[in-house]
Amino acid sequence: MSKSYTLKAEIRERVGKGSSRELRRNGLIPAVIYGDKQPPLAIAVSYKDIFYKIHAGGFRTTVATLAIDKQKIMVLPKDYQLDPVRDFPLHVDFLRISAKSIVEVNIPVHFLNEDSAPGLKKGGVLNIVRHEIECTAPANAIPEAIEIDLSSYSIGDSIHISAVQLPKDVNPVIQDRDFTIATIVAPADMDVSDEVSEQENNEESE
């Protein structure tokens, strides 16, 4: 689980494009807090803080506390808008949560032991179908990543969600099929039949 952090914020008295431009000139960006059956709350947060949090990674899987005057609100960043040319943050949406909340998050997939994967050592290519997996998880226990060990996978193998050991209380949103996360495929110049024959010979000799 990523370490939680606190951001200072202030209530926005005005909304709209003119107000947003003024905020950005003063080193702030507009944001909104929604959810938990409460009306949306328009706020402003530090541009610098949000910029570094986004580019550090894990922004949408890490719980934050927004300090607004004497009030503290636990939130999960749900979405953000970037300038299409200069790639800096323009707006952030925060979901209001509690420690007991169950939230939907896209958790990144990390592949381990690529150097020792039999299929990759023989020239195979890791074809990643899903770089993230949409899951439900406790708000106070969102994993930083889902780790998949490649050390036992050969050319032609597929990695499905059923083969992945997820942390406690973390479940994929898709429940109606055993979806594929990645495959190890043969390079274009490899004869797959030779690889299959080699695997069969190895199994017979064991």
Curated annotation (Swiss-Prot):
Keywords of the record, alphabetical order, are: Ribonucleoprotein, Ribosomal protein, RNA-binding, rRNA-binding
Any one GO BP annotation for this protein:
translation
Provide one Gene Ontology cellular component.
cytosolic large ribosomal subunit
CDD domains linked to this entry: Ribosomal_L25_TL5_CTC
Quaternary state and interactors: Part of the 50S ribosomal subunit; part of the 5S rRNA/L5/L18/L25 subcomplex. Contacts the 5S rRNA. Binds to the 5S rRNA independently of L5 and L18.
Stretches assigned to coiled coil: none
Similarity remark: Belongs to the bacterial ribosomal protein bL25 family. CTC subfamily.
| Protein's UniProt name | Large ribosomal subunit protein bL25
NCBIfam families per record:
bL25_bact_ctc (TIGR00731), PRK05618.1-2 (NF004128), PRK05943.1 (NF004612)
The gene it comes from is: rplY
Its biological purpose:
This is one of the proteins that binds to the 5S RNA in the ribosome where it forms part of the central protuberance.
Ribonucleoprotein found in the keyword field: yes
Q: Quick check: keyword Iron-sulfur in the entry?
A: no
A molecular function GO annotation: 5S rRNA binding
